[in-house]
Amino acid sequence: MEHDLERGPPGPRRPPRGPPLSSSLGLALLLLLLALLFWLYIVMSDWTGGALLVLYSFALMLIIIILIIFIFRRDLLCPLGALCILLLMITLLLIALWNLHGQALFLGIVLFIFGCLLVLGIWIYLLEMLWRLGATIWQLLAFFLAFFLDLILLIIALYLQQNWWTLLVDLLWLLLFLAILIWMYYHGQRHSDEHHHDDSLPHPQQATDDSGHESDSNSNEGRHHLLVSGAGDGPPLCSQNLGAPGGGPDNGPQDPDNTDDNGPQDPDNTDDNGPHDPLPQDPDNTDDNGPQDPDNTDDNGPHDPLPHSPSDSAGNDGGPPQLTEEVENKGGDQGPPLMTDGGGGHSHDSGHGGGDPHLPTLLLGSSGSGGDDDDPHGPVQLSYYD
C-alpha cells in the first residue's frame, strides 16, 4: 500500500477495539430479544393488516438490524447504523403522513423527499467504502440491486397490505444488512492486517534518507578511489612510452661539448661534424675547438692520447653509469647518457649495434618534463614498448 511521501513517520499502532462491556452487551441482547418479539407479534397478529402495520413491522426490523450491528460490529454503526436510523425516521414520517392533510401533508412530502436523498447519499458512501475495502464491481452491483429490490418490494408490500408479504420483505432487508456485515467483517479484517503489515515496513522518507546516506557513502568511496588511483600531481607511475621506435635521432640542442650524436660516429662515440679550427691541429693530433679537458685536449678527435671515461652529456665526467634507456626530450636539456642496446639507435658504448629491435624494451627514464635530471626526488617513469 502506497504511503504519502509528505506524511510523517508512522505512529504507534492503535490498539484494537475491545468487545463491548458485559452490561451494555447484555442490554443490547435484551433489546434485540424484545424487538424480535414485538416484530413477530405485529406480523402474526393480523394477516390482513393495513399499510400502517407494514410500516410498523418494517420500523421494528430496522431497530433489530441496528441492535445486531451494535452487538457484533460497533465500528460500523456510522455507515450502516445511520442508514437504518434514517430509514426508520422516513418510515415514521410515512406513518404520520398517512393521516395528514393540507399544508402539513405538503411539508411532510418535502421532508420525505429530503430523507430519501439522504438515504441515497449514505448508500453511495457505503458502496464507496466497500470499494476501498476491495469489493469488486460485481459485488457492488449486487448490493446496489439488492437495495433497490428491497425498496420496490417494500412499496409492493404497502400496496398489497398482506402480512405474509410484509414478513418476506422484512426478512430480505435483514438478509441484505447481514450480508454487508459479514462481507465487511472478513474483508475489513484482512484490510486491517495489510495496513499493519505496511506500517511495519520502512517509511518511504526513511528509505529516501537511507538511500541518500548510501549515495553519500558511495560518493565518498568514489572520491577515495580517485585519490588512490593517482589523479594527483605529476605523471603516473607506470606509463607507456610512445617515443620513436628503436631510439631514433636526438634532434634537440647540442651537448655542452659542441657535438651532435646524429652524424657518423667515431670510435669514441662522438661526432666530428662540429665546426673545426681552420688552423692545423696540435701536435697531439687533437682538435681544440670544443671545451677542453684539464689536459688541454679535446675528446672529439680520433686520436685521444689519454684514456677518457664516457662523458656525461650534461657535463659530468665519470661516475657510475646511469641505468636509463631512453629519455624523451621535450624541449629541455638532454637527460643522462644512454646505455642501452636499443635496436637501430645509438649509444655511447655499443655503436651502431644493438639488441634485437623486435624485443620489448623496458624504459627507466625521467618524467619527460625537460627539467633537471639530477633531482633525486623527481618522479620516475616506467615505460614499456615494443
UniProtKB/Swiss-Prot annotation:
Stretches assigned to the Extracellular side: 45-51, 97-106, 161-163
A matching Pfam family: Herpes_LMP1
GO cellular component: host cell membrane; host cell plasma membrane; membrane
Any GO BP: symbiont-mediated transformation of host cell
UniProt membrane topology term: Multi-pass membrane protein
CTAR1, as annotated region: 194-232
Start and end residues of each stretch annotated as Disordered: 194-386
Subcellular location per the Swiss-Prot or TrEMBL entry: Host cell membrane
UniProt biased composition (Low complexity): 251-267
Keywords, alphabetical: Activation of host NF-kappa-B by virus, Host cell membrane, Host membrane, Host-virus interaction, Inhibition of host innate immune response by virus, Inhibition of host interferon signaling pathway by virus, Inhibition of host RLR pathway by virus, Inhibition of host TRAFs by virus, Inhibition of host TYK2 by virus, Interferon antiviral system evasion, Membrane, Oncogene, Phosphoprotein, Transmembrane, Transmembrane helix, Ubl conjugation, Viral immunoevasion
Cytoplasmic side, ranges: 1-23, 73-75, 128-139, 185-386
Region (CTAR2): 351-386
Compositionally biased intervals (Basic and acidic residues): 210-224
Transmembrane segment boundaries: 24-44, 52-72, 76-96, 107-127, 140-160, 164-184
Motif Interaction with host TRAF proteins, residue range(s) on this chain: 204-208
Modifications made to the protein after synthesis: Ubiquitinated on the N-terminus.
Main location: host cell
Domain of life: Viruses
Record function comment: Acts as a CD40 functional homolog to prevent apoptosis of infected B-lymphocytes and drive their proliferation. Functions as a constitutively active tumor necrosis factor receptor that induces the activation of several signaling pathways, including those of the NF-kappa-B family. LMP1 signaling leads to up-regulation of antiapoptotic proteins and provide growth signals in latently infected cells. Interacts with host UBE2I and subsequently affects the sumoylation state of several cellular proteins.
Domain notes: Two regions, C-terminal-activating region 1 (CTAR1) and CTAR2, have been identified within the cytoplasmic carboxy terminal domain that activates NF-kappa-B.
Similarity-based family: Belongs to the herpesviridae LMP-1 family.
Subunit composition and interactions: Interacts (via PXQXT motif) with host tumor necrosis factor receptor-associated factor (TRAF) proteins TRAF1, TRAF2, TRAF3 and TRAF5. Interacts with human protein ZMYND11; leading to negatively regulate NF-kappa-B activation. Interacts with host UBE2I; this interaction induces the sumoylation of various cellular proteins. Interacts with host IRF7. Interacts with host TYK2.
Name this polypeptide is given: Latent membrane protein 1
